[in-house]
């Protein structure tokens, strides 16, 4: 009888420990058993939107991740248009990428939107901003309206559909694992999770 009275306590302890394990495992989600990228490198996709405050807050962590990448790993930023109103920012990123200005202006655009309050939500506002930054605004508009930029936006949308991206920021590691700020307690922890998943892929 004494043993039977102990069973509920034992079950509580077991399920408490199981709860901890489930919580730990949910810091990332395995979405595939197979690598879904064509590159020989370990690919990290960062799905983002310039208007997203969480994406802005994540930027220092993404910089840290990128600075510490080894030669076998690559970070690819994907400005996803989950809503029609987001497309202007996706086109802006790809226009700047083709002008080789994405590294120069990526963080500055986040700052302009989230600190200075300039939403940059039209082509005209972006054109004026590019001009104020001392770059060729005419060239920016040409790239913004180009067929090549439209193709890049569509490719980003296909990737988002493939990985079932429903919110940003979201990171996909080598087509197999998904993680985001909503699955961890801090951005430092997100950094650690990304490093863990990179190492898992190296071993594989």
Give the predicted meaning of each segment.
Residues 50-54, 81-85, 111-116, 148, ...:
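Solvent-exposed loop/turn segments at secondary-structure junctions
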Residues 56-59, 86-90, 184-187:
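Conserved strand-to-helix beginnings and helix N-cap segments that scaffold or border functional pockets
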Residues 59-66, 89-93, 106, 123, ...:
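Extracytoplasmic/secreted envelope proteins and their assembly/folding machinery
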Residues 132-204:
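C-terminal cap of thioredoxin/glutaredoxin-like
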Residues 51, 66-69, 96-100, 113-117, ...:
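Sec/Tat-exported extracytoplasmic proteins
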Residues 71-98, 103-131:
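Structural microenvironment flanking redox-active thiols in thiol-disulfide oxidoreductases
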Residues 2-84, 154-157, 161-162, 167, ...:
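Extracytoplasmic thiol/disulfide redox context detector
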């Amino acid at each position: 009888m004494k043993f039977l009275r102990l069973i509920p306590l034992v079950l509580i302890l077991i399920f408490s420990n199981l709860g901890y394990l489930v919580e730990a495992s949910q810091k990332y989600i395995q979405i595939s058993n197979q690598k879904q990228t064509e590159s020989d490198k370990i690919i990290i996709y960062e799905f983002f939107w310039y208007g997203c405050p969480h994406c802005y807050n994540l930027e220092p962590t993404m910089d840290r991740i990128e600075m510490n990448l080894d030669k076998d790993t690559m970070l690819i930023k994907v400005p996803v248009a989950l809503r029609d109103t987001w497309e202007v920012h996706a086109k802006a990123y790809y226009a700047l990428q083709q002008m080789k200005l994405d590294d120069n202006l990526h963080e500055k655009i986040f700052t302009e939107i989230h600190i200075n309050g300039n939403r940059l939500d039209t082509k005209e506002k972006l054109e004026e901003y590019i001009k104020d930054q001392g770059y060729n605004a005419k060239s920016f508009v040409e790239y913004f309206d180009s067929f090549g930029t439209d193709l890049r936006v569509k490719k980003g949308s296909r990737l988002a559909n493939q990985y079932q991206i429903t919110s940003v920021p979201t990171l996909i590691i080598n087509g197999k694992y998904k993680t985001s700020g909503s699955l961890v307690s801090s951005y430092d922890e997100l950094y650690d999770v990304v490093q863990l998943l990179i190492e898992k892929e190296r071993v594989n």
